[in-house]
Amino acid sequence: MPMTTPALSRRAFLGAAAAAPLAFSTALRGARDVPVGLELYSVRTELAKDLLATVAAVGRMGYQVVEFYAPYLDWTPETAKSVRKVLDDTGLTCHSTHNNGPSFTGDGLKKAIELNQTIGSHAIIMASAPRATGIDGWQRVADQLSSIAQQLKPLGMATGYHNHQIEWREVEGKRPMDVLAAGTPKDVILQFDVGTCLEVGADPIAWINANPGRIKSVHCKDWSAGTGYNVPFGEGAAPWKAIFDAVEKTGGVEYYLVEQETGAQSGGELPMVQRCLDNWKKLRA
């Protein structure tokens, strides 16, 4: 899909300029300073009540980055500008968004690009591929990601894929995650959800080491056999220190995103993500 209007070209230039320093500055800061953010699905109930106030509250807690999820595509341009102001006012940044199917075709892609550029995000991540069946289906997903990556590259932007459980289970003798990794160029991000990897018994360290430089962001979601996802980040079974070491030495991580699937039933979403951030600080001390 051509993106050649003068306004979009100007945005593309600005987007490229904004995105380029991230990896460079991360390398200069050192591994321990990789910023920590929040996948805003973790506060979805609060977000639905008051978008701007919830984002501001997350910033005041001390999170450095946020990632918006699929409903953001319903925003108007004015809403995106208001969100950007809150991000700037609280010192938050947004490097990526989670997206469903409409963000990857036609006018949906165009709108996703424009909204992401407004809020400073440079990566349009595919949140899942629920319709993919069989290895041929997963190869089509890889082909789609490759095509989107080509369209986004001149704009200083990227795409990527976020794993769930299904991508680790073999289909016709192959794991869909391996098909996606092998079938896409190296600039397609392999956003790593740790909890779902652990749930199905896959090896997180082996996956990171097999894909050097492609794990640009990590969803820090914990899991344990006894509680499933009903456990705060840092209190489950994930070997976080080994994971941090691998993604910082090999994976190419540029930012972390805490994701907490439970919260409203555990005293509230905002107190829960504060607890997760406190646990993060202990792990990184």
Where are these regions (language model features)?
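Glycine-rich, proline-tolerant flexible connector loops at the mouths of alpha/beta enzymes
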Residues: 67-84
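Conserved residues at the C-terminal ends of beta-strands
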Residues: 41, 69, 100, 127, ...
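Active-site acidic/histidine proton-transfer and metal-coordination neighborhood
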Residues: 17-27, 65, 72, 90-96, ...
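Catalytic-core regions built around general acid/base machinery
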Residues: 79-89, 144-152, 243-246
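Histidine-centered catalytic micro-motifs
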Residues: 38, 159-165, 218-220
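Histidine-acidic metal/acid-base catalytic patches
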Residues: 2-6, 11-37, 43-59, 120, ...
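Alpha-helix N-cap/loop-to-helix initiation residues
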Residues: 44-47, 76, 105, 134, ...
